[in-house]
C-alpha cells in the first residue's frame, strides 16, 4: 500500500530517500481535506491569481487548468494546482452556495438536514 485508504495520503516507504517530501505532501493534503472548504463548485475557469490554499470542486465544463478534472478537488498549493479524486463520504462546505455537499461516489450532492426541523437548523 502506497497511500492511506481514506484520504489517499502518501505513505513513506522503507528505505525511501527524501522522506520529508512525502511527509510534507501528506501534510498539505491533510490540511486541505480536513474541514474542507471550497470557494465554488460551478466556477469553470480557474482564478487568474488564486490565493495559496484556494480550493474548488471542478465542474464538468472546466477550462484551462481545470479541463479534464471534472468533479475533482482542485487545490492551489505551492504555486500550482493539485487535483484530488474525491472518495465516497467526503464532505465540503461550498462558500458561494453556503451549503455542505457530500461526494456520493458519482456526484457532489447537497447534504440533507437530519432533523425534522429541516433547514431551520
Language-model region placement:
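Glycine-rich, low-complexity segments
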Residues: 1-11, 15-47, 98-121
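Short, surface-exposed terminal/edge motifs of secreted or surface/virion proteins that either
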Residues: 31-35, 55-113
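Residue-level detector of intrinsically disordered, flexible termini
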Residues: 48, 73, 91, 118-119
